[in-house]
Curated annotation (Swiss-Prot):
PTM info: Phosphorylated by cyclin A/CDK2 and CK1. Phosphorylation probably enhances transcriptional activity. Dephosphorylation at Ser-118 by PPP5C inhibits its transactivation activity. Phosphorylated by LMTK3 (in vitro). Ubiquitinated; regulated by LATS1 via DCAF1 it leads to ESR1 proteasomal degradation. Deubiquitinated by OTUB1. Ubiquitinated by STUB1/CHIP; in the CA1 hippocampal region following loss of endogenous circulating estradiol (17-beta-estradiol/E2). Ubiquitinated by UBR5, leading to its degradation: UBR5 specifically recognizes and binds ligand-bound ESR1 when it is not associated with coactivators (NCOAs). In presence of NCOAs, the UBR5-degron is not accessible, preventing its ubiquitination and degradation.
Residue ranges, annotated region (Self-association): 264-594
Natural source organism: Sus scrofa (Pig)
Residues bearing glycans: S10
Modification sites for Asymmetric dimethylarginine: R260
Gene assigned in the entry: ESR1
Protein name, entry field: Estrogen receptor
């Protein structure tokens, strides 16, 4: 048998022919769709050179002749890439696979059929570093791009995002925890370093008060004893700074009555407060309830408040004990009264009475069961009515005169020195005469004053929310309790049932006159402020602005022209800053009654 000899080239061609015949049933014709318009910019024209720049600065020419390129599979079914049968397998062996003793630097990848995307655009804007060349010798793959093109797994990115979100939320919760502990100095409104001499104060005001009570404190104000004390101007006037220290409640003892007893008593009180919060606040509202200052947390539910179980005698005793102390004015009888001097005396006296009024309100039974916002709002609405009923009560024994303080007794003629004051004087004198005719008793007076406080803003700030409805119901229950106490006093005095009803109606009708006088007084005080007759104190000024915002004339109408947007933002929706600061830190029972 004769064996035909073949050269190496003819032998390889024969081998390729045999393999092509065996694989011919598997081949399918390539479907070619004619293009209706020219290729876009993202497609490659094989007739043009293609050079692509990578971020690392290396340029790759994909139309250059590739030496020893690895073939790849096409995407159309099981067929190999288009081209001649011999070229479909490349030049390196069967099916284009690398020999076992060689390692290809390029991976075997699956690519799109022609027309091919020039380099394939990833949705995230990254370019895939594999590219198919259309050469006469067959399809080949260029080497993969630099390792810098490696794209992280999407799951890893999501996990990293979740970790960043978790760390951000942890930082946010830590920031909120630290914000809840932020306290401000009651004197200058700087950051407080601790609880010193009975109030939260900074190191500077603490040291100043310590030096003042230990050494000489005969400070003299170079102005009118009305200097503003804040963070930037606290060192400008020592006299006014010391006066403000006393006004906010600083005392020589340095320990409040409810803080005596040492560390064990402090821990016991904290445990009691925690138990009270758990009873009063639902679990879902615990986080929001902790934002309020601890002395004002509600410790009892409204329906189970111990105030509602008080007897009439216990209610009277509590109201009498809550009465504020007597305050003296700065009146100098040797100096004649003028418009500026009289308004200065009255505003100074009112400003100091406001601080004592805050302490009195907190001792009214049932008042502390309300939220902080509602307590401050009631005070903002009723403060001038409360001052006026106290003035009328003190003036009952002085017909034709008004007793503003034990050392300040004014008649109608003296009120003429202030423009517009005579009308208010006449109304106050008429109400005092009415009290005198009715022979108003001290127990009835304290009940009427408490009714003014609780009834002043109950219909102006409560919304239809469940919490507001609960507050409204609680206020009405306390008002009913005080009304029952009034009836008990009348019955105890020996009045018949008909006389009790008549006297109760007469007393309650007088309260409407106090509301009318209060509105007149607010208008007059506001006019004096606009005329710059007298500089108002910070607390009195904020109370005046808050009352104007709560007044019915401003509901739905434009705000006062002289108020800035920041004042509207703070006063309209939240309690006044100065009043809230006095409310939380002020201890009026320790204030001096004279200056």
């Amino acid at each position: 048998m004769t064996m035909t000899l073949h050269t190496k080239a003819s032998g390889m061609a024969l081998l390729h022919q045999i393999q092509a015949n065996e694989l011919e049933p598997l081949n399918r014709p390539q479907l070619k769709i004619p293009l209706e318009r020219p290729l876009g910019e993202v497609y490659v024209d094989s007739s043009k050179p293609a050079v692509y720049n990578y971020p690392e600065g290396a340029a790759y020419d994909f139309n250059a002749a590739a030496a020893a390129s690895a073939p790849v599979y096409g995407q159309s079914g099981l067929a190999y890439g288009p081209g001649s049968e011999a070229a479909a397998f490349g030049a390196n062996g069967l099916g284009g696979f690398q020999p076992l003793n060689s390692v290809s630097p390029s991976p075997l990848v699956l690519l799109h059929p022609p027309p091919q995307l020039s380099p394939f655009l990833h949705p995230h804007g990254q370019q895939v570093p594999y590219y198919l060349e259309n050469e006469p010798s067959g399809y080949a793959v260029r080497e993969a791009g630099p390792p810098a093109f490696y794209r992280p797994n999407s799951d890893n990115r999501r996990q990293g995002g979740r970790e960043r979100l978790a760390s951000t939320s942890d930082k946010g919760s830590m920031a909120m925890e630290s914000a809840k502990e932020t306290r401000y100095c009651a004197v200058c409104n700087d950051y407080a370093s601790g609880y010193h001499y009975g109030v939260w104060s900074c190191e500077g005001c603490k040291a100043f008060f310590k030096r003042s009570i230990q050494g000489h404190n005969d400070y003299m104000c170079p102005a009118t004893n009305q200097c503003t004390i804040d963070k930037n101007r606290r060192k400008s006037c020592q006299a006014c700074r010391l006066r403000k220290c006393y006004e906010v409640g600083m005392m020589k003892g340095g320990i409040r009555k409810d803080r005596r007893g040492g560390r064990m008593l402090k821990h016991k009180r904290q445990r009691d407060d925690g138990e009270g919060r758990n009873e009063a606040v639902p679990p879902g509202d615990m986080r929001s309830a902790n934002l309020w200052p601890s002395p004002l947390l509600i410790k009892h539910t409204k329906k189970n408040s111990p105030v509602l179980s008080l007897t009439a005698d216990q209610m009277i005793s509590a109201l009498l004990e809550a009465e504020p102390p007597i305050i003296y004015s700065e009146y100098d009888p040797t100096r004649p009264l003028s418009e500026a001097s009289m308004m200065g005396l009255l505003t100074n006296l009112a400003d100091r009475e406001l601080v004592h009024m805050i302490n009195w309100a907190k001792r009214v039974p049932g008042f502390l069961d309300l939220s902080l916002h509602d307590q401050v709002h009631l005070l903002e609405c009723a403060w001038l009515e409360i001052l006026m009923i106290g003035l009328v009560w003190r003036s009952m024994e002085h017909p034709g005169k008004l007793l503003f303080a034990p050392n300040l007794l004014l008649d109608r003629n003296q009120g003429k020195c202030v423009e517009g004051m005579v009308e208010i004087f006449d109304m106050l004198l008429a109400t005092s005469s009415r009290f005198r005719m009715m022979n108003l008793q001290g127990e009835e007076f304290v009940c009427l004053k408490s009714i003014i406080l609780l009834n002043s803003g109950v219909y102006t700030f409560l919304s239809s929310t469940l919490k507001s409805l609960e507050e409204k119901d609680h206020i009405h229950r306390v008002l009913d309790k005080i009304t029952d106490t009034l009836i008990h006093l009348m019955a105890k005095a020996g009045l018949t049932l008909q006389q009790q009803h008549r006297r109760l109606a007469q007393l309650l009708l007088i309260l409407s006159h106090f509301r009318h006088m209060s509105n007149k007084g607010m208008e007059h005080l506001y006019n004096m402020k606009c005329k710059n007759v007298v500089p108002l104190y910070d607390l009195l000024l904020e109370m005046l602005d808050a009352h104007r915002l709560h007044a019915p004339t401003n509901l739905g109408g434009p705000p006062p022209e002289d108020m800035s947007q920041s004042q509207l933002a703070t006063s309209g929706s939240t309690p006044s800053h100065s009043l809230q600061m006095y409310y939380i830190t002020g201890e009026a029972e320790n204030f001096p009654t004279t200056i």
